[in-house]
């Protein structure tokens, strides 16, 4: 959409640059529009420079993006905990961050393999998950 808008503004600018006889108020409006158009083009150029720089970093492999995996191992034919008293993962105590002893019934086991520390928080609240099934 940005490119479309830029093309539209460029066409407007070319039409405005043609000398026309008319009302002095119209001429002043054209000049103001041309100034506005230049500001928009400058902003677009700056944003293109920033995006191309970030793309080059990712292509060169020097970007700070890391891939994080979480393993979820669910033992079949056994029900996981549905208790509302459990905070976070069902077999990891939220206060001590230690694995709780399994209750009499089996539960789903979770393990965080790696997390990204250097990367800033994502803009989206969605998380990517990978499901791993036992062989």
From Swiss-Prot:
Question: Per the record's keyword annotation, is Transmembrane helix included, yes or no?
Answer: no
What the entry lists under Pfam families is as follows:
HGAL (PF15666)
Instruction: Print the keywords alphabetically.
Output: Coiled coil
**GO biological process assignments:** regulation of B cell receptor signaling pathway; regulation of lymphocyte migration
Asked whether the keyword Coiled coil is assigned, the reply is yes
Q: Which PANTHER family match?
A: GERMINAL CENTER-ASSOCIATED SIGNALING AND MOTILITY-LIKE PROTEIN
The scientific name of the source species is: Homo sapiens
Coiled-coil region(s) at which residues? 26-50
Record's superkingdom? Eukaryota
* UniProt protein name: Germinal center-associated signaling and motility-like protein
User: Looking at the record, which segments are called Disordered?
Assistant: 1-68
């Amino acid at each position: 959409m940005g490119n479309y808008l830029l093309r539209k503004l460029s066409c407007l600018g070319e039409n405005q640059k043609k000398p026309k006889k008319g009302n002095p108020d119209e001429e002043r409006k054209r000049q103001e529009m041309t100034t506005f158009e230049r500001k928009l083009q400058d902003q677009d150029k700056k944003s293109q420079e920033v995006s191309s720089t970030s793309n080059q970093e990712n292509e060169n492999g020097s970007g700070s993006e890391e891939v994080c995996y979480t393993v979820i191992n669910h033992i079949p034919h056994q029900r996981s905990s549905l208790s509302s008293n459990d905070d976070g993962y069902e077999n990891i105590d939220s206060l001590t961050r230690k694995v709780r002893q399994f209750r009499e019934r089996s539960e789903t086991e979770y393990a965080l393999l790696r997390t990204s520390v250097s990367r800033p928080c994502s803009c989206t609240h969605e998380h990517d998950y990978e499901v791993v099934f036992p062989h």
